[in-house]
Swiss-Prot record:
Residues that bind heme b: H73, H108
Name of this chain's protein: Globin CTT-W
InterPro entries: Erythrocruorin (IPR002336), Globin (IPR000971), Globin-like_sf (IPR009050), Globin/Proto (IPR012292), Mb-like_M (IPR044399)
Note: There are at least 12 different components in Midge globin.
Region forming the signal peptide: 1-16
PROSITE patterns to which the protein is assigned, alphabetical: GLOBIN (PS01033)
PANTHER family given in the database record: GLOBIN-LIKE PROTEIN (PTHR47217:SF1)
One GO cellular component term: extracellular region
Amino acid sequence: MKFLVILTLCIAGAIAHCDKAPFIKASWNQVKHNEVDILYTVFKAYPEIQDRFPQFAGKDLEAIKETAEFAVHSTRIVSFMSEIVSLVGNPAVQSSIDLLLVKMANDHKARGVTKELFEKFNIAFMGYLKSHTTWDKKTENAWKVVGDEHHAIVYSILE
């Protein structure tokens, strides 16, 4: 029931926040090809996240950063984010965003990923965005408002 209430609020929020999409898309377009750097930043800030990835657990981050395996996995993560960003701001496809987020949350929950790890990932990711894009109050607000809605869906599953 909690999930359905959150989902309903997110759909309503998507309509109310169409004005946020241009800020999210503009900033994302500045970093969406920095896949390796984004994941490297997350792993550097929170090694416990790196340890959740069997292919990278216990390995030297500096050594794996340059590998094809790291590049492929980084691209997989950032491509998912790009898909979400491409849909943001279009109320007609909000249910698609919600379904993508639900699937991702369920997949990660099955692997033992916690809400706390997702929060840490988000902190590192937002730090990367702020330091690698043209960042202002409107951009920050857009990411916060839309991000909070998306996180509510993910967290409702991980809790």
